[in-house]
């Protein structure tokens, strides 16, 4: 900043010594001009300071409806709007591939961040699912959505009454045991992922031990329907559009949607490598702001059909719009011929704080990982969450895009209640575990996947 301008601001009396401004009105004019220049210079400096360090990043996604904010940010030019025109959004074959490519990082042919199952950044940061159990530090920058995953059941069980209640599976389980036959098989998408937690919670609520009574297998989301068609599993848990596609192809039906297990539950997150974010803080914020704006677009019901067309294209999910649109519009057809279709069961991208990464939600996922023996005893929940969850970055970005009103009063949403009446108090995760009847804390029971 020119010294003369500083002098005028800090010592207005010095303006009297300026030959160009001997009269009072001319002195004021000089001061106003100087102030204008100062503010313009400061604004330009701020813009330069906020400029992304790079214009490129590689983000992964799985072919699921809830990756929509990444597709929309790319298709609608939002990454470019925030100074990141060269962001690539790259399809991953499975959650295992997502993990592998995050471990590599873009510098080694992998990716920098991803549409990811909310517990995965924790499992990776702790080295629970990485090669050689070497930690791969990750951050969660935002939640991508609430709701709209489902547990789908093979058509042959339609008359058994398996739906919200999993207990009607019990006679089938016992019959298989008596015959020495293959146990009933339940598929999910990744061991330390949300879908494994949902199907385990549902089975346990019905009195079925997922580590003893049934077999569990890992299947990538786009392969679920094909595998059920050939009889490789009796039920699966996955996100849309695959549950709707199963019904459209008359292979099975929806037993329960996950928002019926836990209303407005968190699902996917925007996860990024810690080292990438730390090295490119402005670029990380630019990506986050683009995603947040995309979430607002996705949450507008008027955009549902446009979004379904975009997501269904070959570039993205590559499926029929009829597999995506109904549940995107909040319309649920269970496909069992018994329960009436429902409306209003929306996947939420922005409303009701769907984008904010509540730390209390992360704590529930860690408690469930602990419940089933994936998460070791003695780990400090709050310390781990503090290292991974970047709610602070989300709040900063919300202010910068004019969404300060969407910042919740607390990082905790408080006590949560599940469909079986069980409550989770984030202040006491171990107390929550103590009251659960079916669990596998040491991971030694059965052949846990």
Name these PLM-found stretches.
Residues 42-48:
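Sec/Tat signal peptide C-region and signal peptidase I cleavage site
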Residues 279-392:
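Secondary-structure end/capping motifs
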Residues 363-449:
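Conserved C-terminal helix/tail region of periplasmic/extracytoplasmic solute-binding proteins
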